[in-house]
């Protein structure tokens, strides 16, 4: 079982806000080359669901739906906050092609790979758990990523998942 062409591209689009376009851009060419070699017609149908006019509103709705009512007016707290709401959540989280569970799982992997982003990793671990990607699932994801992100970042991610599970589900 692999990813469909749309899913593969959505995994890349999701990476932009977490890894940065500079790190992700080369993978678009490689992915396009692979898809073309497999006979996939490019460009793929757009998965976008927002416009420049409604991306902030839709981003805030998505952020509140996933992270809770405390995210209301988050965009008003600074320029980077606004960018997070309208670009990350308005442009990417609202796209078709990946459901919330898959999009959050991918996001969890990207943040864990960064290291030093534990507050964000905790928020996304909690949201993963609330969406059904439970502690056991996230631990398996971390184990599969050890060769790619190393032991230190993996151990940090394990600590964060334990904290997230306790926050969402209470103590065992």
Indicate where each model-derived feature is located:
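Short, structured motif recognition centered on aromatic/hydrophobic residues
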Residues: 11-12, 102-112, 121, 138-142
